[in-house]
Design a protein with these regions (language model features):
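FIC/Doc superfamily catalytic core
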Residues: 1-160
């Protein structure tokens, strides 16, 4: 295989995590930590645990975003998951998954893997709503071979 060992491990971990997407309960915070443990296995010491230190996003030397202090992370994550559980029947899954993604990335609960986990969890929320987002679903049958028209999305728009 070509590539750095860390990159190869990231791909293996992501594959393993996405294989579980159909089994994930996206409203369970402990499951989020468990899947993070899979996503970051052999890559970081705090795999599967919320961060204990401060975290920011940097562009070279410049800090472009500073996450909330680590001491607030458990409470912020509980609030986010409580909100999702409470609103999952009232808020459309497309909106719910986007709000989750935004809030999750803002909270930045882990030392590493936040972007990967946000994308995976976003997909897990959507997979509970529609099978097109499930792992292993052949997406080709959602499209018209004759016209190249995205049938699934046209039907979705008709229902909204």
């Amino acid at each position: 295989m070509l590539g750095e060992q860390k990159e190869i491990q990231e791909v293996k971990n992501a594959y393993e995590a996405y294989e579980k997407i159909n089994e994930i309960d996206p409203y369970d915070i402990e499951e989020l930590k468990h899947i993070h443990g899979i996503m970051t296995k052999y890559l970081i010491d705090e795999s599967g645990c919320f961060r204990h230190g401060e975290e920011g996003v940097f562009n070279g030397e410049e800090c472009i975003f500073m996450a909330p202090p680590a001491r607030f992370v458990p409470h912020l994550m509980e609030e986010l998951f409580d909100w999702m559980e409470r609103e999952k029947e009232e808020v459309h899954p497309l909106i719910l998954s986007c709000v989750f993604h935004y809030e999750f990335v803002f909270i930045h609960p882990f030392t590493d893997g936040n972007g990967r986990m946000a994308r995976l969890w976003h997909t897990a929320i959507l997979a509970k709503w529609n099978p097109i987002f499930e792992s292993g679903t052949p997406h080709s049958h959602y499209f018209s071979d004759e016209l190249g028209v995205p049938i699934f999305f046209a039907n979705l728009c008709d229902k909204m």
